[in-house]
């Protein structure tokens, strides 16, 4: 995950099986990641199965979504937000990072090629 975060943002969904809001959020993030076509990557971390990772991110409540950018965590949001708000948060992050992370523009170019559709 850290190595990949040097190229494009890695959005980390910190969740648990028993968490109702987590179950609402996960499909939204998966859909947005697919639409992002490589401009960012989704990683899912079950906090019960990975307590050390949860502790490293400072998880106090779930769902919690952070981005790892250049190996550094960046808090995005907590809770199951409405899809338009999540989309806006991720789009804003991509816009801010586009010039610093060449993997974003490379993914956008690839997605724009006719045979990649």
Descriptions of predicted regions:
Residues 2, 88-117:
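Non-globular targeting/processing and membrane-anchoring segments
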Residues 8-9, 24-45, 51:
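Conserved helix-turn-beta segment immediately C-terminal to the redox Cys motif
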Residues 11-14, 29, 42, 50-78:
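A short, hydrophobic beta-strand/beta-hairpin element that forms part of a small beta-sheet core
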Residues 60-102:
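Non-catalytic, surface beta->alpha helical segment in thiol-disulfide oxidoreductase systems
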Residues 1-9:
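A short beta-strand-turn-helix
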Residues 20, 49, 81:
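Short alpha-helical
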Residues 14-28:
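Conserved redox-active cysteine motifs that mediate thiol-disulfide chemistry
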